[in-house]
């Protein structure tokens, strides 16, 4: 016989909040979840991501180890 009452309660409509706003409902072991970042406000998914690369990694490596580029 399996042990009873060893599994956590399952909430099929757990509410996910981000900055106090309901963003989605999911299945979880807690009735409410609070997240800081989700796909609706993450820069990668919203298209507002900026890549700041003042010096390329290869060029920095070559300069650091004194290698000549050809």
Swiss-Prot record:
One GO term describing the cellular component: chloroplast
InterPro entries per record: Ribosomal_bL28/bL31-like_sf, Ribosomal_bL31, Ribosomal_bL31_A, Ribosomal_bL31_sf
Domain of life: Eukaryota
Keywords recorded for this protein, A-Z: Chloroplast, Plastid, Ribonucleoprotein, Ribosomal protein, RNA-binding, rRNA-binding
Subcellular location: Plastid, Chloroplast
GO molecular function, a single term: rRNA binding
Chloroplast listed as a keyword: yes
GO biological process, one term: translation
Record PROSITE patterns: RIBOSOMAL_L31
Function: Binds the 23S rRNA.
Subunit structure: Part of the 50S ribosomal subunit.
Family named by the database record: Belongs to the bacterial ribosomal protein bL31 family. Type A subfamily.
Listed name of the protein: Large ribosomal subunit protein bL31c
Native source organism of the sequence: Emiliania huxleyi
